[in-house]
Amino acid sequence: MTRFAPGAPAWFDLGSPDVAASADFYTGLFGWTATVVSDPGAGGYTTFSSDGKLVAAVARHQIDTPYHRPYGPGNDQHGMPAIWTVYFATNDADALTKRVETAGGDVIMTPMDVLGLGRMAVFADPSGAAFAVWRKGVMEGAEVTGVPGSVGWVELVTDDIGTARGFYRATLGLAPADTGRKGVTDPVWHIHDTPVAGTRELGTTGAVRPHWAVLFSVHDCDATVRRAVELGGSVENEPVDTPRGRRADLLDPHGAGFSVVELREAYPAAADGAS
């Protein structure tokens, strides 16, 4: 299992108004296996595995703030929004909460222990993009990333990259740097010289608010898009070739945005060098 360095994207879950329906959609789309956590205190939290390795999860969404509606008030069908959340690894969720407040972010959910699995908190950056942090307990995070069937990349979709540069450096220790690649102008976030996340200009998708976007690695972007539509999803941006690979932007049946991409190269998670 990967040991995630502080600041690296470590876990990904979907907040949904209908966990069972969302599980059906994503297992049908990616071939995942869904497993409901047996602990009664988990509230039906359902994990997704690809080839036996944890990749993501879905939970009943119980938080409704403007931060959780990046596609506006219409991105739900059951009174609650649906959204993917990126969790960044941290060694101390409580200390990071203080850094978020100092840097001008908002605390949506104060640090809390999660069934002995770890400790989490939920924040929003100064532009309103929601994200979470994860202090590992017995659960490290995703057991695989960067390969088809798992999260391949994450992006900050924002209209204020200048403020984001300072905020994420001060809170998560992310260092923004230009890619140096032809056709890619938005900065990429690094940890120890390892690229871990990207940025995208707000307005390139149907989103109306800043947010963190999740991109799933797939073998065939076009076939995945067709399958998503068959399962009740919709297309925000049709497949297009990009410097990072062929990608498309989608909405699931409950309005949660996500992307699929045929990565030209895998982006490894920033691993913690501790033994």
UniProtKB/Swiss-Prot annotation:
Q: Does the keyword Repeat apply?
A: yes
Superkingdom assignment: Bacteria
Domain VOC: start-end pairs: 8-136, 150-263
Q: Does the keyword Mitochondrion apply?
A: no
Q: Where is the signal peptide?
A: none
Q: In which pathway does it act?
A: Antibiotic biosynthesis; daunorubicin biosynthesis; Antibiotic biosynthesis; carminomycin biosynthesis
Entry-linked InterPro entries: Anthracycline_SecMetBiosynth, Glyas_Bleomycin-R_OHBP_Dase, Glyas_Fos-R_dOase_dom, VOC
What keywords does the record list, in alphabetical order? Antibiotic biosynthesis, Repeat
What's a BP term from Gene Ontology annotated to this protein?
A: daunorubicin biosynthetic process
* Job description of the protein: Involved in the biosynthesis of the anthracyclines carminomycin and daunorubicin (daunomycin) which are aromatic polyketide antibiotics that exhibit high cytotoxicity and are widely applied in the chemotherapy of a variety of cancers. Acts jointly with DoxA in the conversion of 13-deoxycarminomycin and 13-deoxydaunorubicin to yield carminomycin and daunorubicin, respectively.
Q: What is the protein name for this chain?
A: Anthracycline biosynthesis protein DauV
Q: Which organism is it from?
A: Streptomyces sp. (strain C5)
Q: What is the lineage of its organism?
A: Bacteria, Bacillati, Actinomycetota, Actinomycetes, Kitasatosporales
Gene giving rise to this polypeptide: dauV
